[in-house]
Amino acid sequence: MNMIDNAKAQVRQLTVAAYEKAAAAGLLPAGTTVEPAVEIPKDTANGDYTTTFCLAAAKAMKMNPRQVAQTLADAMTLEGSYFTSVEIAGPGFMNFRLGGKWFADTVAAIESAGEKYGENDSLAGKKYMVEFVSANPTGPMHMGNARGGVLGDTLASVLQKSGAHVWREFYVNDAGNQIEKFAKSLEARYFQIIKGEDAVEFPEDGYHGDDIRELAQAFYEKEGDKYLDCDEKTRHDALAQFGLSVNIPKMKSDLARYGIRYDQWFFESSLHESGYVAESVQALTDKGYTYEKDGALWLKTSEILASQLRREGKSDEAIEKLGLKDDVLRRANGFYTYFAADIAYHRNKFAVRGFDKVINIWGADHHGHVARLKGAMDALGLDGEHRLDIVLMQLVKLVRDGEIVRMSKRTGKAISLTDLLDEIPVDACRWFFNAKPETQMEFDLGLAVREDSENPVYYVQYAYARICTLLKTLAAEGYTVPAAAEAELSVLTADEEKTLIKQLAQYPAVVYLAARDYDPSFINRYLVELAAAFHKFYNACRIKGEAENVLLSRLKLADTARAVLKNGMTLIGCSAPEKM
């Protein structure tokens, strides 16, 4: 139940009822069809809710807006409503002030919803896939993967809370150029182990990390030199499969440690082995979107994108300046490109598995691939423009003692996800990486482990633990949290109490916005604001030592804040410790 929406709906009902009453009495012209717009004022000194109905309706009535507002206020009956007063302000605003019934009903609604508080049905019946991380299985996961993991996992949770059926997927790039480069890197280290470091030159564009040395050593210890003199393909296949058999379980383990589990790990190789890549390329050919040149098969990407841009109103001259290019789907050697496999993979998501919406979390460096992939889906008749959404996330910079920690996966000096989790608590990692995806972020390693109010995750968890300690202390004295119906909630009249309840009422709207905008960082910001509202309430409104009716009502409010804090922390994958 969204108590803010309920209050807004009641303002509209009261306003319309007052207008109809005044019109029936001949005090206002009949026939006005203006829908009352209701907002929460930025300055609550002006009331809790306001409507601009009179400003809009007065034009049609050819009357002074303040006169219309006063007539409505005189005709309005607030008895039994959530509001105690309505005031006229400015040129004709009608400002409504909440009464005790709304505050009591809000606490009761949160109690009734329990763990389901904040849920909405805006995406009910929709089948969503969120594909995220999908790191190359050729080495340790880096900070971009760490950020993408949190964003994808938390977004999936937020979408679920908005009613969607959500599928989490990791796309394993176990085919193509990256795997060949992986095999050649392992091969060079394998040869060096057998023949000596200086006897074999390492590929300049290979993977230089220590993990490659370790994999090659493990392969040698298992197989010896049996692959030294065999044909290259056999050796490459054996090395690559061995490396993947070590790396992929390690990735799964690290992500599970990070609180991330997938519904499916989908392997690129399966698309090739099943013939689905070839089938998907043929589907594009059948629709007239491919052509052959220099022995290769090309997608008419420029034609597809130009058509889309014309639909958006772009002129041919503007389109020509973009320098759109076509893409190779099948090389002259007969091998399919990564783009061809990606098209097949996304066709599988829509045409085979029937997802209504697919969301990919990508690094911002992939921005050039977005329109191409959406266009390919459009060409296949799968409405990529509306069904495929790409969330682009900016780079991550690690900062320690005010200095940026440089990352370079190929020089072997990268800080991996494993390294990060060894140093920083999972809760802090998940909190800080759950920032707005379009902003470049600096992850302050020092701040993440601080135990003070400067660290937002600590600040929020401390508020939760503080409430748990309070409940435990009062329980020892014989006071238990009452049900909302048994508490005398009408005594909660202090500004800090009302502010806290209003903040608690915001949660469902925050969840809705996080899902709508694909931005789960809404939850983080809300939790900090909720923790601040609780601390102000706790510092201003004494609980122990008060009259029993006040003590129990404030105890109920504190416990309600505890429940919503836990709800939000759970949603973003952070723990809610009962003591710090």
Name every feature range the model reports, one short phrase each:
Residues 2-104, 111, 115-580:
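Non-catalytic interaction-recognition regions
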